[in-house]
Curated annotation (Swiss-Prot):
It comes from Hepatitis B virus genotype D (isolate Germany/1-91/1991). Signal peptide: none annotated. Homodimerizes, then multimerizes. Interacts with cytosol exposed regions of viral L glycoprotein present in the reticulum-to-Golgi compartment. Interacts with human FLNB. Phosphorylated form interacts with host importin alpha; this interaction depends on the exposure of the NLS, which itself depends upon genome maturation and/or phosphorylation of the capsid protein. Interacts with host NUP153. It holds the Pfam family Hepatitis_core. This is Capsid protein. A motif (Bipartite nuclear localization signal) lies at residues 158-175. One of its GO terms (biological process) is symbiont entry into host cell. InterPro entries: Hepatitis_core, Viral_capsid_core_dom_sf_HBV. Residues 143-183 are annotated as: Disordered. Keywords: Capsid protein, Cytoplasmic inwards viral transport, DNA-binding, Host cytoplasm, Host-virus interaction, Microtubular inwards viral transport, Phosphoprotein, Repeat, RNA-binding, T=4 icosahedral capsid protein, Viral penetration into host nucleus, Virion, Virus entry into host cell. Residues 155-177 are annotated as: 3 X 8 AA repeats of S-P-R-R-R-[PR]-S-Q. The modification Phosphoserine is found at S155, S162, S170. Belongs to the orthohepadnavirus core antigen family. GO terms for molecular function: DNA binding; RNA binding; structural molecule activity.
Amino acid sequence: MDIDPYKEFGATVQLLSFLPHDFFPSVRDLLDTASALFRDALESPEHCSPHHTALRQAILCWGELMTLATWVGANLQDPASRELVVTYVNINMGLKFRQLLWFHISCLTFGRETVIEYLVSFGVWIRTPQAYRPPNAPILSTLPETTVVRRRGRSPRRRTPSPRRRRSQSPRRRRSQSRESQC
């Protein structure tokens, strides 16, 4: 079966493959980040989002893989074979987990649309011949925000008065503005 773990999130394995292998932090760093940012949501019995569910599954699978690696390390007698298994897990499976964890943590942090826009931008940048592309790759945190997190209820935006607007307003107008900002 050819299963793409990013399909339902609007991305693909191929889209993530444009990022170099050393782009992704270590699994340990990603697990620490997920724990620091999303521990309550990940441990909650409530469903939060598909990204939380995917993160939970990836974390559980990584734990099982580490249990297997520990067992192999303790039970495989041949040091050369043991080293081959450890290297395979770290290089191949480790990269897949690093990509998966990075994707879902980034989607929860920046928003799915921003992450996909970043992946597309980076893919275009990396495939553009060096002579025709800007010297610096796109950076996820500098992309324009597409999602805005707001508290429940609406609070009006503070606006700077335009130069054409008179500075003095009637007291009645001021009171209504202050009443709105308290909501």
